Every structure is written in structure tokens, then in C-alpha cells.
Amino acid sequence: MAFDNHQKDVRDRFPALQQEQVFFDNAGGSQTLDTVIDSIRDYLSSTNVQLGASYAVGKKSTAAYSAGYQAAAKYINANPDEIVFGASTTQLLRNLSYALKFNPGDEIVVSRIDHEANIASWVDLAERQNLILKWWKPAPGPNPQLLAKDLAGLLSSKTRLVTCTHASNILGTITDVRDVADAAHSVGALLCVDAVAYAPHRPIDVKAFGVDFYCFSWYKVYGPHISMLYGSWSAQTHLRSLGHFFNPSATLEDKLGLAAGSYELLQSIPKVVEYLDSKWDKVIAQEASLQYELLSYLIDKPNVTIYGVPNEHVSERVATISFSVKGWNSKDLVEAVENKSTYAFRWGTFYSDRLVREALGLGKDGVVRVSMVHYNTVDEVKGLIRALDEVIGNSS
């Protein structure tokens, strides 16, 4: 397959792309940048010691770890004291839910169309602390959206927390979190945002977003299998520390880290930041081309239902596109295409069961999801379209 020079330069940075498999399952985890792989190997080869030691290799290890914190914080426009790393977004949000302190009868508002990572912890919190749980439920249909104006009837002087996604891992739809933050803050509530499906596609500025807590996974942003949670200094006043009694509790890492930030993975984050910092305009433009190509095909198929915003506007969606085909079970369709091609994409509910079953009205096999990122090419999308068309044809 031929690539233009820029796209070839991009793809050359990802060793996994130098094989026949075509990756359209990027929402489940992106491929890893070459310098990240090298950094992890080098750390384990020469600096794999406990942090804080005074000997030479110990100092080098500690410096690399600290550089990871510095780079990650700067990347999202935060301070190092405001971030913590962990094994997954699910784990970090669960830790957060155990650290937050509210009073019986206080209210929390939880989006019902999120990934379960940003739902289950809050349902559990409400049960443990005798809180009133209010569901933020967009109307059922193929394009449910989280809009700040729909919060009006859910917020009150007793609201303490609002939770939502920045971009749906099924729909690809972008939530205006600044509007949601303003609405939540108008009644003195905190806002917690799951940005896992947003972070691979757009730059992040937590101060501009106005969020109190913000979480995403670096392994979906071309990096190592590690996740990160931001908590503003003011929001941290609502937290108790989960750490040992004799340890400090000043930073978010002190409060929630529980020694879960793998050293070799965390210290590789500067390589991701270095790669992305100068590329965002090209990333967004490339993904716009990809989603335009696929959506144009799907829109013209009368037997296809697209879920989420049915256009390629980058202000409204990211390049995660889900659909179903009349007369086809999603599992059977994906496997039929995979049996005839090298295209890797998925079917299912992707841990957004409430969204898929309630809002979209689908069963356990859920949607067909094609999730693209900037290292994918228009030619790859055209190839997938041909493979899809061979299977679903002109049936209606």
C-alpha cells in the first residue's frame, strides 16, 4: 500500500504497523510509539531500582520518574501535584470514589451513557455514603448527546458531583465539558470527566475545560499501558488520603497513588508528549479525512444505522464510528469481513452496556465499531469499505 511522505513518516514511528494487519480497533488501545518501546526497554535494562535511593543509578531512576510526572502534567496544563498514575482509568476512578467525602442526602448526577468505569464507582459511592443518585439520561435514539442545558432539572443546592464522558467510546460524540463544568459549578458541584475516548484525538487543557477531575489512559494515546487522573488543588480538599498513615498526603499521588504507577511505564510518557506536541493540527486533519470517507459510505447505505453524530465535523465527533446493518448481527458481520480480509475492528457494547441497551435499544452483540486514529490512511478506509460492501452489498 502506497503512502504519501508525511503519512509514511508517521507510520514508520509505530513498529506494529509494519505488518499486514490493518488496525481499526484503536479505541481499545492504540499501537505504541517506537521511542516509548525503546524507553521502557532502556529503563528496565539500566535503571530498574527503587526510587529515592542516594546511589547513582537510584538518582537516575528517580529523575526519570520525576520527568514523567513533569511532562504529563505540562501536557494537560496542570501541576505535578495535581496528577496521579495508575493501572487503568477504572482503577483510578474507583480510588477517587473511595477518597471523596460527602454527607448523607447529598446528591450526585451521573451520566447513564458513559463507559461503566465512570458509572459503577459512583453508584457504589452513592450506596456507601447514602447519597441521592440522579441519572443524566439523554432521550433514546441513534444520537444521544450530553448537553449542559439538560442538566437544569437535575442540579440543586445539594448537588455535590456531576460525572460525564468527554467523548463517547461508542458514538464518538464530543461533549462540551466547559458548558457542563459551568453548569455544575453554578450550584457548587464538582465535575469528573472520563476522557479515555477523547484523549487520542485532541489536545487537553484541563484549566480551559474547567474540570475538577479528569481521567484518561495513555495506552490509547500511543503510549504505555498506564492511566492518569487529574484533580485540581481545590477539588483535592474534598479527598481523604488512601495512603499509609505515616506517608505524606499533600499531592494527588500521595492521596490516591497506592504505589500503582509503574516506574518503567510512567517514565516513558515524555516520549509521547514529545511526539504529539507538534502534531495536533495534522492529527485532526487526517482523522477528519478518515471519518469523512467512512461516514460518506455508511450514510449512502439505506440498511445502515449510524450511531452518534452522522457527519465528519471535528468539533462534534472523533474518528470512532459505530453502526449496525439491518439483517445482520454485529458479531456475524465483523467476523464475516475479518474472514475475508486483514481488517481488525470490533463488535460489542465496549463496557457501555447502559448506552447500547437502553439508549440505542440494541442487544448483547451491540454495534459494529470502527475506531480510527491519525496513523490510519484513507486507502485503508477505502479497503475496509470494499470489504464491507462485499459482505453487506446492496441488501436493505
What are these regions (language model features)?
Residues M1-S396:
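Pyridoxal 5′-phosphate
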